[in-house]
Amino acid sequence: MGLFGVACTSACSEREEPQAAAPKAAAQPDAARPLATEHAGEDAGDGGPRADAPEAGPANVPSDPKGNDEDDGVPRVYAKTRFVWIWPNPSSEGQWIGFLWTGGSVRLRDPEPRFGPGCRHWYAVEPRGYVCVDGDRATLDRDDPGYRLARRFAAKLDSPWPHRYGESLGLRRYATPPTPEQQRLREPDLRAHLERVERARSGEVVEALLGVDLARATGTPIEIAGLPRSVHEPRNRIVPRSAVAFTDLEVFAHDRSWLLSADLMWMPKDRIVPYPTVTFRGVDLRKTATLPLAFFRGRDRPRYEKTPEGFVRKGVFARLSWVELSDRQERVGDDTYVQVRGSEDWLKTSEAAIPEPRATTPWGAAVGKPDDSGKTPEGRATWIEVSILGGWLLAYEGTEPVYATLISPGSGGLPLPGRDPLETAATPTGRFTINGKFATATMVAPRELIHGDVPWTQNFSGPYALHGAYWHDDFGQPKSGGCVNVSPIDGRWLFEFTEPKLPEGWHGVRWLPRLEPSTTLLLRR
């Protein structure tokens, strides 16, 4: 059931149930430490919070981001599986307007059920819509054993990283930790693989296992019971280079270590390369810095000093760091140099990503000035501007820029005339609207490549989405299959900033134009 139709391409691809887009294969993060004189991307700068303790976000933050504030005394619906649909009326006919997720819950608007097509017990939930409570997929009993198990491993939506993540080396998933015989039947290369594991544990460098955490788990297996089969994604085989999400639970069984996936399946730990935590974050322009500023993308970039002989290099600006800029510029041949604000350092504009705000808002008001256009949109008048070639993003509230960061567009750059952007992994240009928001979303591409539980996904056109990327930290550079990648920290900030708001307890929401405003997204060169 797609959100706005079904697509499955090598770029932005089919997402299970609600549609989104899949970026291309994972790239290993390569953290760079900044010099002391510029701001690190993983630190918000002068006194701002670090990435390991990020702020909740700009607005629209529920008291309990998981939607599991169960001690408030208000009756709730509790989700025991994925995609517990929320419908506009007590009927499964028509289009859903949102959904709950495994281990989540939402308050009831009315404790009395209603009968309607598709379900005997429809319950009205906050702030709108109806959920079918059948006891299997959803329950009113917070002490339901299946729900309590699901809640234990629910996505951590109060964190930019709802799960742990890694890259598949090619693996099989199991409903229970398998016996050695079951493993041999499902994994034809098991004997050779386990021999490589033992060699690597003995200290030999085994290239095929580089990055794999071979430490034996110490946990004890638990029974995954009391939940419907729909709690699991419909795949047992994960192809190499796919990105997978998993919980904190690691167990040892049948002489092997196992990880419990985000959808409560068991995966062999020795076939997964954990991703380093991506900690890059953008700049809050209301708290940390002001425009103009510059980011450094791709690699460390030269730092210049102005001398009587001209501009000479005197060090580097670290990759993914940023600086505020002064209004002092000098032209030398084809190069333009700008002085760093409050410093004797200079940078070359061609070696930095410098966000350049539009002169006007999408409705014609002057940016940076009071809005006297008389055309201000309803709601908070939020909009986002993205430069595909520049690799940057600016978020606005009304006429004011409020956030700046780096993004990774499609690896194909700009669309080619006469070619479908999906064919070239390009990011489309134009004006779009956020039409669906999903706290996590598994994305599926051709050849069964997946990116599991991609965080902070916001659809804006067909299979294209703005979303967090946990599999690389090369922001500012073209990386995706056409979607707009941001860091998980930036993804969560933007998810909470944009309209429509994700209601408390919901995991996904469809934009309903008749009820609420939506954030405009402008994608340009």
Model-derived regions, located:
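Exported/periplasmic cell-wall-interacting domains
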Residues: 377-379, 413-415, 425-431, 436-525
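Short, low-complexity, disordered segments immediately C-terminal to signal peptides
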Residues: 15-42, 52
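Bacterial signal peptide processing site
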Residues: 9-15
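SH3/SH3-like (including bacterial SH3b) beta-barrel domains
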Residues: 89-102, 227-242, 306-321
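Extracytoplasmic
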Residues: 72-74, 81-83, 120-122, 256, ...
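Cell wall/extracellular polymer interaction/catalysis modules
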Residues: 314, 326-429
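Boundary regions of SH3-family modules and the immediately adjacent low-complexity/disordered segments
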Residues: 56-77, 119-229, 259-300, 339-379, ...
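Bacterial N-terminal signal peptides
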Residues: 1-9
